[in-house]
């Protein structure tokens, strides 16, 4: 008996994350890509812009009602912050059963939406058809902090450095290689969206200082943690090993991980555990690819979870 594929569409596919999503969908044995919306690329063949996709599908310029009318089983919104609402409203009105995954920050604080960081929240998934994908920095911070969350004596301080792909494709100083050359660009040093996101999700205040670097992809997150009780390096290392023992995408390493080694891969490396004299302050380093585990890979994990498939299907 032939099993009908699950149909899926992407809105906002011109960006770097959209390109990664297309590759993952093309590798998924149970998904069929039925539309890809991009105003800038409308009319062009998807295969001309994606190495992993083979077929005659072309980009279309679709408004919210047109997306809803496509009646896809799954829709992924890969739009800038503040742009998702019309698409959500149109799908809610005509296709509420659609599985909708939003990669922007628009619904991360909405309790009606499942917040999908599988390694930390999959136990709370209860069949929701609306899934909010976490931020890239926010993913790194939460994974680095969680094993010691109950031991915290104060707000974690998080120094984040991202490749410039994290600034999107719309030209700006933060994705201009000429301005970033030999440079490190601090921005939004208080009250960043991901600072608020992590503080809300973990239930503890977090202090976050983001920077953009000249490399294209990958995040390094260095986290300073003050502890209520002294812990040795060995005890701290053991807590991380225990917490993530059954998480295939998370690797606990001894040395501080390098972003160049994580770029282009689906997982997270956490390591570099360094304890200050007195054993009540520890520094932890996490690295991940902002376009993959920070966006597209995580969306695919959430999709697989919601549809009852192996969470790592298509994630090679």
UniProtKB/Swiss-Prot annotation:
GO terms for biological process: L-arginine biosynthetic process. It catalyses: N-acetyl-L-glutamate 5-semialdehyde + phosphate + NADP(+) = N-acetyl-L-glutamyl 5-phosphate + NADPH + H(+). Its EC number is 1.2.1.38. GO terms for molecular function: N-acetyl-gamma-glutamyl-phosphate reductase activity; NAD binding; NADP+ binding. Coiled coil: none annotated. Keywords: Amino-acid biosynthesis, Arginine biosynthesis, Cytoplasm, NADP, Oxidoreductase. Pathway: Amino-acid biosynthesis; L-arginine biosynthesis; N(2)-acetyl-L-ornithine from L-glutamate: step 3/4. One of its GO terms (cellular component) is cytoplasm. CDD domains: AGPR_C_ARG5_6_like, AGPR_N_ARG5_6_like. The active site is at residue 136. InterPro entries: AGPR_AS, AGPR_type-1, NAD(P)-bd_dom_sf, NAGSA_dehydrogenase, Semialdehyde_DH_NAD-bd. Belongs to the NAGSA dehydrogenase family. Type 1 subfamily. Catalyzes the NADPH-dependent reduction of N-acetyl-5-glutamyl phosphate to yield N-acetyl-L-glutamate 5-semialdehyde. This is N-acetyl-gamma-glutamyl-phosphate reductase. It comes from Xanthomonas campestris pv. campestris (strain B100). The gene is argC.
């Amino acid at each position: 008996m032939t099993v009908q594929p699950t149909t899926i569409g992407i809105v906002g596919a011109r960006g770097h994350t959209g390109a990664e999503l297309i590759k993952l969908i093309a590798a998924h044995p149970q998904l069929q890509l039925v539309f890809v919306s991009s105003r800038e690329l409308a009319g062009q063949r998807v295969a001309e812009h994606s190495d992993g996709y083979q077929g005659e599908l072309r980009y279309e310029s679709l408004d919210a009602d047109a997306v809803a009318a496509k009646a896809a089983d799954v829709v992924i919104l890969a739009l800038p912050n503040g742009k998702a609402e019309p698409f959500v409203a149109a799908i809610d009105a005509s296709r509420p059963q659609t599985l909708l995954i939003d990669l922007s920050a628009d619904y991360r604080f909405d309790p009606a939406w499942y917040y999908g960081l599988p390694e930390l929240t999959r136990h709370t998934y209860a069949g929701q058809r609306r899934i909010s994908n976490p931020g890239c920095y926010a993913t790194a911070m939460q994974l680095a902090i969680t094993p010691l969350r109950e031991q915290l004596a104060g707000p974690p301080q998080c120094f984040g450095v991202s490749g410039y792909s994290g600034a999107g494709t719309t030209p700006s100083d933060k994705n201009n290689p000429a301005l970033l050359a030999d440079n490190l660009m601090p921005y939004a040093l208080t009250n960043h969206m991901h600072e608020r996101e992590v503080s809300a999700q973990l239930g503890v205040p977090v202090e976050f200082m983001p920077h953009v670097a000249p490399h294209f992809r990958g995040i390094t997150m260095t986290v300073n943690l003050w502890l209520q009780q002294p812990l040795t390096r060995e005890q701290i290392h053991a807590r991380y090993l225990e917490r993530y023992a059954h998480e295939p995408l998370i690797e606990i390493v001894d040395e501080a991980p390098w972003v160049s080694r994580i770029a282009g891969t689906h997982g997270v490396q956490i390591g570099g555990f360094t304890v200050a004299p007195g054993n009540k302050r520890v520094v932890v380093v996490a690295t991940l690819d902002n376009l993959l585990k920070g966006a597209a890979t995580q969306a695919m994990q959430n999709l697989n979870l919601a549809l009852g498939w192996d969470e790592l299907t298509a994630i090679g």
